[in-house]
């Protein structure tokens, strides 16, 4: 890997994706960027959660997001094949984590306002970034063949982040607030 972290290649709005030169506002590049942003936010959340099991779950999600990003990159570079793909077992792992975390928080009967201690707040923000990443991937389905497990995985991830934020709030003794509308 080069020691220089700039090339000047992107100074005019293009980037390199494998062997392809593409515009930075390309829909695939946008989706990859949203997944990358989510990964960064999970890193911040992980450093701010008080629960070791939740932190380990976030580290797992971060690694899996690289698999999602690789799958998206392969849409534009046909010479690149990801070493791993998101599959039904990955989705099942998230569903189990959602069920386990949901069992530790009260049943939800109203909308919940985002926030709480920093760990929960970062998880709430990560959830919204996950939803945006999911929408940007859905937007690719009209032009590209997307692994259906990626779509399901991204949907479940935002659900898990919501439940984890609620769990952290409960663990920290923060009462949920509900919108008045």
Give, region by region, the residue ranges found by the protein language model.
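Phosphate/pyrophosphate-binding loop motifs in nucleotide- or prenyl diphosphate-using proteins
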Residues: 1-181
